[in-house]
């Protein structure tokens, strides 16, 4: 949307790896993000974003990004198939027993 305007643009950066960012546009796009320094040198972030879809509904997502990767949730995303969840659970059990994956 070329005519969209920024309604809100808030940014705070403490200079030490801690930050907060939030914006909203006139066409319904929203994004909020908070970050803190991570234990392995990365920046840990969590936030949410949303945008309007052509049918008038809104696509909404929440996420965490940290030393364990990027994890996003949304009603629009499919569920993990049962066989995949079983593999994830099995790997977690093995890690708990001390198995190391290279």
Swiss-Prot record:
Keywords: Cuticle. It comes from the Eukaryota. InterPro entries: CHIT_BIND_RR_consensus, Insect_cuticle. Residues 23-50 are annotated as: Disordered. PROSITE patterns: CHIT_BIND_RR_1, CHIT_BIND_RR_2. Arthrodial membrane and calcified shell. GO terms for molecular function: structural constituent of cuticle. This is Cuticle protein AM/CP1114. It comes from Cancer pagurus (Rock crab).
């Amino acid at each position: 949307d070329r005519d969209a305007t920024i309604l809100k643009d808030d940014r705070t950066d403490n200079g030490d790896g801690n930050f907060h960012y939030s914006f909203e546009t006139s066409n319904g796009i929203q994004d909020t993000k908070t970050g803190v320094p991570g234990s392995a040198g990365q920046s840990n972030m969590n936030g949410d974003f949303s945008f309007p879809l052509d049918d008038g509904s809104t696509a909404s997502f929440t996420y965490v990004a940290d030393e364990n990767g990027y994890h996003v949730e949304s009603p629009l995303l499919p569920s993990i198939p049962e066989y995949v969840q079983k593999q994830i659970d099995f790997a977690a059990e093995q890690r708990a027993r001390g198995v190391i994956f290279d």
